[in-house]
Amino acid sequence: MIYGNVEKEIIQLNEHTVWSGSPNRNDNPEALAALPEIRKMIFEGNHKEAEKLANKAIITKKSHGQMFQPVGNLNLSFEGHQNYTDYYRELDIEKAISTTSYVVNGITYSREAFASFADRVIVVRLTASKAGSLAFTTNYSSPHKIKKFSVKNLDLQINGTTSDQDGVKGMVEFKGITRIKLEGGKIAKTDTSLSISETTAATIFISIASNFNNYHDISGDEEKRAEDYMNKAFGKTFANLKAEHIKGYQKYFNRVKLDLGTTDATKLPTDERLNNFRNTNDPQMVALYYQFGRYLLISSSQPGGQAANLQGIWNNRLSPPWDSKYTININAEMNYWPAEKTNLSELHEPFLQMVKDLSITGQQTAKDMYGARGWMAHHNTDIWRATGAIDGAFWGMWTAGGGWVSQHLWEHYLYTGDKAFLASAYPALKGAAQFYVDFLIPHPNKNNWLVVNPGNSPENAPAAHDGSSLDAGVTMDNQIVFDVFNTAIRAAQILKKDASFIDTLRIMKAKLPPMHIGQHNQLQEWLDDIDDPNDKHRHISHLYGLYPSNQISAYRTPELFEASKNSLIYRGDVSTGWSMGWKVNWWAKLQDGNHAYKLIQNQLTPIGNERGAGGTYNNLFDAHPPFQIDGNFGCTSGITEMLMQSDDGAIHLLPALPDVWPSGSISGLKARGGFEIMEMVWKDSKLIKLVVKSSLGGNLRLRLPNDLKLANGATLKEAKGENSNPFYFLNETAKPIISEKASIKAPTLAATKLYDIATQKGQIITLSL
């Protein structure tokens, strides 16, 4: 993180594996014996007593999760630079380069910085417009208790060890090296600092490494790694490093282009545009925010690295909010919603690998705590892939973390068609289903439906349960089990495996509770009709079935579609940053572009401090508050869903176009089945050109807002029946149970055209008016 200070610049340093603690487990061995009594209490309506027992017997008595921690700061001091003019600062997200410039005594000083993926170093170039006039002092600082600063030869070095946390000894050892290449001038050293004088330009190289190999192995040599990174990079010229950095970054970033139009507002600084956004016409601000989300994912989730956490990879606190770890009851999943559809599939890999890791560590949790096969995780995890229940039963007594994250494995397959990947992911998909096969239990008061007990609707509780969140057969649990069973069935069929297991899953799936529509015309959050229309809770977990799942559809389940809309209206718009990001996706799925845009306006509300409602900080980081990166990713996903959706049997184009974007274009989006939207142009809210590439072949079903023709003038074939493309197979959602007090209206939808086009692998289809 580059602060951009003039006299006292701070380069705040993070490395993705620098976490507190060391390999550990946090299961509670008392859980299995207490499980029958907890279930009995819940079935009998004694929710509060069940929560008390769960706090004692299920919530961990060990670690409640470890913390993502900073390395420290590299400080640059420029004596005499306190009086400056012409200050300018920018982040070029097309190149991932930060620049700062200013003038002191008629001399222009410039700083240019980037983090090179290829060379594993941070590079900062300092220049002065007058020869020999650049001078500065540099040193490390760090909040860690165990740390050492030194200078070896002319290398500025930091060594440190991460913190102990919750009785787990901090054993991640890290090493940082700063080496400076001068163009003229002098360099002097003390025991802990370097001083540069009489130079015209200086290039600072920073390498960082740790001893972390994987979640169960910290035997790496951080000293050698940091030295190797430095030595490899230091021999290259700045021009070469910069060119390689830009090439490596733009390999991902340049895949998607979005144009929603521009106005004079683009001439203003970003913070002023943010402050004015609600009251001005600035469509390019939305495009900037959209691409900023992609920039953040590219920067915080490189293949082979750790997944983006609650703060991506940017944290300056030894003890950050919520430990800056992985909250898997929404936040971590939201981080990766843009990955596939915004053409960043490779950057999904760190999260997919984390899911595979959890499918290993979660096996012992499933067995020891719940007597089940397969694997599971609760609502949080960390770099050590802990899967125990933490934070108290109100939050932590939730067994669906593993089930939800496993769906990302399936999504990656649906977009790429990579059968080798599916084969590698199948044990995790099967294991998630195996857990539920053993964990589900008949509900004695509800038609013997198979339900999750104990469960909860994340972080929320109905007033009828005396403030307890614990319940049986919660809507979100039912929806996740439905998805877990279906993806395991489909994966097994594709891989021609486990026929008898498929039969078991089908039988059990038929016994899951259907969704319920309650007395307030709402989609019920719980099996009982106890929703409060005045509840404004940030989590609206029962709408998982609308998004990111596709169980609720405007065309297949109109009653559930309308009930979801009612639930969303009851909850309101303004909330935490990430919640508003999720709502953009929901309103896009509800095909209401104007309401989705209203949520974008709410999210792009400037937040000046870490209190109050959610919004956006001046640097465009999402504000929960405090900073959480999930809202950035959620909104980027939602903007994509406004322009293209591909989860309801067809590629639906412009499903939620707001009035404020009457004309525009986008290129590079990915749809399920290996289709790429190479170009989509609309004018006066009408689609005028579409170019689609089919990388896998198969039927291309398009749902369009208006008629288009093939490039040769031929008319399109009207689609009928189910889509023959297997990547667009739809699982039938059970008919809902509707309260006698409800009066559900049929949804009002814009007219669309549905067409089928047979494609071959590699074929490009062009359509126009």
Language model: regions and residue ranges:
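Acidic/histidine-rich catalytic neighborhood
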Residues: 431-491
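C-terminal catalytic domain of Rieske-type non-heme iron oxygenases
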Residues: 312, 316, 450-454, 458-460, ...
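Aromatic-residue-lined binding/catalytic grooves and analogous aromatic/hydrophobic interfacial grooves
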Residues: 1-394, 400, 405, 411-413, ...
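Loop/turn elements at helix/coil->beta-strand transitions in domains of secreted/extracellular proteins
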Residues: 285, 418, 447-449, 592-595
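Inter-helical turn/loop segments and adjacent helix faces that build the functional surface
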Residues: 342-346, 409-425, 440-443, 485-501
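Well-ordered alpha-helical segments within folded domains of soluble proteins
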Residues: 330-340, 399-410, 476-486, 541-550, ...
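Extended, hydrophobic alpha-helical segments in both membrane/secreted and soluble proteins
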Residues: 331, 398-412, 421-439, 579, ...
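Acidic, turn-prone loop/beta-hairpin segments
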Residues: 622, 643, 648-671
